[in-house]
Amino acid sequence: MLNRENKTAITRKGMVSNRLNKFSIRKYTVGTASILVGTTLIFGLGNQEAKAAESTNKELNEATTSASDNQSSDKVDMQQLNQEDNTKNDNQKEMVSSQGNETTSNGNKLIEKESVQSTTGNKVEVSTAKSDEQASPKSTNEDLNTKQTISNQEALQPDLQENKSVVNVQPTNEENKKVDAKTESTTLNVKSDAIKSNDETLVDNNSNSNNENNADIILPKSTAPKRLNTRMRIAAVQPSSTEAKNVNDLITSNTTLTVVDADKNNKIVPAQDYLSLKSQITVDDKVKSGDYFTIKYSDTVQVYGLNPEDIKNIGDIKDPNNGETIATAKHDTANNLITYTFTDYVDRFNSVQMGINYSIYMDADTIPVSKNDVEFNVTIGNTTTKTTANIQYPDYVVNEKNSIGSAFTETVSHVGNKENPGYYKQTIYVNPSENSLTNAKLKVQAYHSSYPNNIGQINKDVTDIKIYQVPKGYTLNKGYDVNTKELTDVTNQYLQKITYGDNNSAVIDFGNADSAYVVMVNTKFQYTNSESPTLVQMATLSSTGNKSVSTGNALGFTNNQSGGAGQEVYKIGNYVWEDTNKNGVQELGEKGVGNVTVTVFDNNTNTKVGEAVTKEDGSYLIPNLPNGDYRVEFSNLPKGYEVTPSKQGNNEELDSNGLSSVITVNGKDNLSADLGIYKPKYNLGDYVWEDTNKNGIQDQDEKGISGVTVTLKDENGNVLKTVTTDADGKYKFTDLDNGNYKVEFTTPEGYTPTTVTSGSDIEKDSNGLTTTGVINGADNMTLDSGFYKTPKYNLGNYVWEDTNKDGKQDSTEKGISGVTVTLKNENGEVLQTTKTDKDGKYQFTGLENGTYKVEFETPSGYTPTQVGSGTDEGIDSNGTSTTGVIKDKDNDTIDSGFYKPTYNLGDYVWEDTNKNGVQDKDEKGISGVTVTLKDENDKVLKTVTTDENGKYQFTDLNNGTYKVEFETPSGYTPTSVTSGNDTEKDSNGLTTTGVIKDADNMTLDSGFYKTPKYSLGDYVWYDSNKDGKQDSTEKGIKDVKVTLLNEKGEVIGTTKTDENGKYCFDNLDSGKYKVIFEKPAGLTQTGTNTTEDDKDADGGEVDVTITDHDDFTLDNGYYEEETSDSDSDSDSDSDSDRDSDSDSDSDSDSDSDSDSDSDSDSDSDSDRDSDSDSDSDSDSDSDSDSDSDSDSDSDSDSDSDSDSDSDSDSDSDSDSDSDSDSDSDSDSDSDSDSDSDSDSDSDSDSDSDSDSDSDSDSDSDSDSDSDSDSDSDSDSDSDSDSDSDSDSDSDSDSDSDSDSDSDSDSDSDSDSDSDSDSDSDAGKHTPVKPMSTTKDHHNKAKALPETGNENSGSNNATLFGGLFAALGSLLLFGRRKKQNK
């Protein structure tokens, strides 16, 4: 910080003397409550500007997080700036913040980091091995009353070194002039910001006068120059080499490369800390103009910071005494190389030495993350210097799920340039932790109340914001060196979501975000011509449900320096200065005096050998003097000045020689001829002290009070000067004329003035707050003022959770943190606000006697406990608002207790035996029922089970809305919901909502009744008349197997009918079931669904639905099949049918009349061939054939009329067919059809029907004697027939007939089995057996749809069956023909 009155640098220790010609602005960490930017201006020797050491305030090292969503955790870094003059760019290096914000209760605290270079040794040295080294000027603390124009301004006096002269003869005056033109240098080259005063001296700071970035520097007259002690040897000017040559081997250097932990926190961070490069370089005299040497640095090093234009800061090396350029710099940043090319300076001077002192930086691009043992190296000439460091980046600022980090990554500032003030870039990492955030918003603001001179700005006219999405799992560079090619540019997605606001801010609405983002803010500086502008920019991330978090960055300035000098010979000179303290010694802050005449005489001849007039800075130089003794005389002193004492101290270069003195030149320059003069002035002041015993007298052990403001006024009350007391309580007003003055002391905070004019010693007493001082030809150092500390006390104690609600602090009860406590005065004005710490403690400090009001804010979810319980006010609760009195001691009795109110929710689960949905007196609870409690978002909170009485309860619940779910107990059904008007007696169902509002809720009940069970069953009877109805004379069939399947087809029960044909399945729930009756051996399924549901047959498989009642309607009937021989004849007919022959055969069938009908059927047979469609017709025919036929037809139905053919063969036959059907009951489906039956044939097999066919053996039927033969055949026939049946499918009718003949054969079941094979054939044409029906929930039978059944029977069986069938047909056909005749 620049103290503009005294122009002194303020460090953490207070005032320091001006020490280093180096311009720097230091970096500070900024707190959340207030931000101070401290800047220290120091001017450097060389024209090179070293960037500021990157440092953060270690004292402010912890991110502050707030307790509410509208408060944020701020973290701001003060990044160092390198401010240039009005036409130059600022050199800035960013500082990533350590995590720190700190606020103090007694105002804004500024803590300054150490300067990058802070010793008096940072200057160019010129020396040879033969030199008589001159002592450098002594640095002493400036008198605090001295007003300075430049802070930290060192008396500019380089070390002067000796060189032997090349020429030993005394030069002529003309020669002297020539040498002067070449070698005289009386100005200083200082590269820094331009600072102007009323008196200005122009100093060239760069050899390239056309470079607008290297503007001239104007130093005020008050700046003391370096003593021009440089002793140079004039070299014969030699032509420079025609060819540039690398002279690294002719350069020797003594180099140190040091890692500087700027904030001394033992953590090295590229953006905070830096490298100090110091080197003393000696140039061999063989080096010529145009030769060059190099400085090579490793890829972990960078030579400039944030400002790309700052590369010039490590630039040309100049002689600070005369401004001449020694070597010019050229940068090759791509190869990390600086090339220095020598000018003709090295041709004209011997033994050139150069010193460089640079601050260089760690390159975050090559150090993206924390890493140990990172190497940094610099090679000057052929000498490499190395060092290593453990790099440790700071963490991001995190608060709950919010996380953020930021840094300035580029700044170009043109101070004083209205048209192009420059720009800066800030890089912000949003949500680097990659948490899922809701309603995430980023606010960027170039404003902070503690920085009224902030030159940052954000608005839509000058600001460009880029937004990049970071891939999941991507590692961001912790030095904020971002490779955007590896990220996704999503700027266009957010163009409409960026809102610019007042006060230089912009808000970006990210919405719901679960990835990290990089936001780059590129904006312009505001115009400024301030010598110490500040740049502060904040970034705050907020999201729903999380506390906001903030970070920020700020900047400061500094310079690098370099320089060199050759050595020249034989000059006399130095300096005339104003010795303000009249001690005869040159000291810092004492300025030169111009226009004083200096005349030099040869002391032996009294001949005048030179004359000069001091320049504005007080310097002079008279060159080209040979060895000898010379008399130096000063004249033409400014009016009113007197000569200071001579020969003071032991340093001839700093003392005064008086108006006339004799000095000797002996093989080297003599630059010690100085003169000190002063204008008589007087001082007024003394001391401000702490009067600890309050007696009004300065006692020996009482100490001064620093920082007290003292104001000097003239007799008319006009303010002349204002100072503050130093660390010892001293103050002084200087440069005062004789007269009367008024002195006023400002009472320091926390103090009270002591008594006035106690005792008789005016130098020891207190003059009070206002006094008069007189100066009369002498200093007046008697004006003192004493103060004693105003007594201060504390008030506070404790906020605790009163778990037992008794209003008293128990030993097991703990404090509540984060409770806001407010202190007010008696008038109700807020004095202080604080929050309880982690232990519930709070305290207000620094309070005077008085009455105060203390208010406690009730923490969320708590209720204040009872007040004033018991007699011990140290442990009771004072409530949420109370009064506290301080009377000469602390008051630590003001406490407040709170408790968390919690409630219960629950009631009862009961068995509602009467199912009325209301708890009746005699109904009991159900134990073991699982009850689940959920919050409004369906998150399970607790689960309990009802106790032995059906009771349940959830405890320790806060106010809110909850969901309660009851699990239906096994064997029960939920009762009706919300019956009646009594909410405490009704059932709330399986799921209900319960609200707790400052009371228990014990109304959530649920009722269940036992789930009823049902029975299913009825009767299996012998349907002797085959009419499909249960007649009173028909009896049940015993031991019929009945199987019960559930809806999934799983067997859940098996039983057998009792001796009366009855069966029953019990304990069934409502639902869908299937009942399967196993057909008794030798019986045939009777017709189904022929009459009322409780009297008919339901078939072999029945689907049934039980809905809240028993079902005793599931019956089934069977009968025994009859046989007929003549049928076999008809079979033969059927043969002819089979021929499908010609219907004429079927005509012959017509003999058997109806057969003829059936013939026609048979015709249809042929149709049947075309397809069993006609068979279906034939069915009807078959019907016509005979009822019994029709039975078989019903078989044949499925069978496609082939049956009907067979029917047509003979009605009875068709019966027999039905026999055979029964065999191939399939036949019953028109036999072979039934062969599809054959599947059922397998029935028929089981029928062994064939046995009954063996009836058909009775086929002996003579009908076909041959039949009977065929019977034996029939066996095979049966097979083959059946097979043929299947063949005959189209014919199958007649086949099936023949089958039916041979059916009996098919009796050989096994054949029939083979039938079933053929059946499979037949199956292709025949319908599935009609034994399965479906019942709806009304218990009405529904016919099942017909489906084909394909069997894998033997093809050979089919073939043989076909052949036998054909043979049988021919025989029968021939026989019938004979009969017809």
Swiss-Prot record:
The places in or outside the cell where this protein is found are: Secreted, Cell wall
Alphabetical list of InterPro entries matching this protein:
Adhesin_Fg-bd_dom_2, Adhesion_dom_sf, Fibrogen-bd_dom1, Ig-like_fold, LPXTG_anchor, Sdr_B, SDR_Ig, YSIRK_signal_dom
Where do the coiled-coil regions begin and end? none
Feature: compositional bias, Acidic residues: 1091-1101, 1118-1134, 1142-1164, 1172-1320
Q: Where is this region: Disordered?
A: 54-185, 857-883, 972-992, 1078-1357
Q: Which residues form the propeptide?
A: 1348-1381
Q: Where is the signal peptide?
A: 1-35
Q: Which NCBIfam families match?
A: LPXTG_anchor, MSCRAMM_SdrD, YSIRK_signal
What is the name attached to this protein's record? Serine-aspartate repeat-containing protein D
> What's the source species for this entry?
Staphylococcus aureus (strain USA300)
